[in-house]
Amino acid sequence: MSSSPALPSRSTWPAWLLLVLAAVAGLGWWWSAGRPVNLPDAPSTRIACVSYAPYRLSGETPFDPHAFISPARIDEDLRALSQRFDCVRTYSQGQGLSAVPAIAQRYGMKVLMGIWLDRDARANAREIAQGIANARAHPQALRGVIVGNEVLLRGELSPKALTADIRQVRAAIPASVPVSYADVWENWLRYPHMAAAVDYLTIHILPYWEDAPVSPEHAVRHVARVYAQMQRAFPGKRVMIGETGWPSEGRPRRAAVPSVVNEARYLREFLAYAATVKMPYNVIEAFDQPWKRSQEGTVGGYWGIFDAHAKPKFPMRGPVTEVPRWWLGWLAAAAGGLLFALLAGWRRGARGWLAAALAGVAAGAALAWQARQMMYACTNGWDWSISIAACVLALGVALRLARAIAAGLDRDEFATVPWQGWRFTWLFALALYGLLQVFDGRYRDFPLGLFALPCIGYAVLALLQRAMPMPSLEQRFLAVAAPLLGVVIVVQECGQNVAAWLWLGLCLAIAVPVFAEWRRVRRLQP
């Protein structure tokens, strides 16, 4: 009894259709990313206050105990920021940041000076002492002193201990300098007695990070509702928004999609709203902070109005383009089409050459998008090595699949399935990454460009198969697991995350043919 029964001839138009759709989708993805998007203008190009952390260059991180930012570097940053901002917010006194008030004063800027608190009592004492000395030395430069940032959210201090630290600072600095504590708005409602210890409330409203993430289209309305709620909850207390903003890169959360366009949309609309209610606010943040990726994934590093090289990411007026050099994606697609036509369509007829070229266009566009994602996501040599190796492997498998597809379409006959073991490998990778997304997906990107190559390639080939070996039990198990995990991810995202739906689509593209083969083999076996 044969385990690889042959099937009669069938139409090849579904395979052609899928190839064309894949190529058009790849080109269309890049084209849409390069279209200017019209947005409402900001009421002004100046912003009241912005979070300032100088750790923007490669290798810089506040977790380095020996890190020190020179006064010259801070001077350079604040001189540039003074052209756009009236105030900067800092978070710590250490690593050279105690110099900020004196330097900001030179440029006519105010400072929301931070004192960093955590569970280290000795470090807290040093921060508090330095903060008190700074406030006494430069009271005229300060818009306020913020004692602690989200320390209750992190669970590193009790409300009682935090209150004692706040009152210590309040008693030691000039009365003209107001004192506050900053945390997510929900924690102020959870610990309302903390309001008695501060001169005003500093609340963080980050629509992207809410437990129920808010889309950019509704984000400012959400901020307005929360701000009004906090004013009602704490009558007689001034309420300041200490952090608000939107990320430009990273993992979507439900309908909250990080992008340059969405960051520009949010900030412009927020500034317009803030102008109507005349509230104090601070936006996060001045510069992208690549070091945050180690804690919060890709998305953590890209909340800046300026990139890590101090270049503005978008204008505050006029159209905004997501990927200005979008044509590089088309160039990669053209290179992929030429490469595949030469290597996979070699010695084929016109139809085989065209099929290989279409596969190459789709592969080139997908790999270019994956490369762009890697540029933002990879934090070290290990990340780069693993990512590049995965892309090379995906390209090799895609090229081999394209050869089989070109052979099948060129002769109008069924193709054999190459590298069955590699299909198992990619199914395993999909299932494994799906598990990570389900149980630890908060900060994980969707590597759609990487997995598009094998998933779509095997889907096209399934429409052209001739020899059909029985898929192994392991393949069948993974072909169930990967889509089921994809469904769970979609449900976790409440059906609002387009990236999650695309991930599920890729899982189905490679998994469904496994069961189609299994059914056909069982049907044809005596």
Model-derived regions, located:
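Boundary/entry segment of secreted carbohydrate-active catalytic domains
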Residues: 28-80, 84
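Conserved, mostly hydrophobic/aromatic
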Residues: 50, 88, 145, 201, ...
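Aromatic- and acid-rich polysaccharide-binding/catalytic face
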Residues: 107, 113, 143, 149, ...
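Glycoside hydrolase catalytic-domain groove-lining segments
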Residues: 209-250, 420, 444-449, 469-472
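Substrate-binding cleft of secreted/luminal carbohydrate-active enzymes
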Residues: 247, 255-317
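Alpha-helical transmembrane segments of integral membrane proteins
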Residues: 347-526
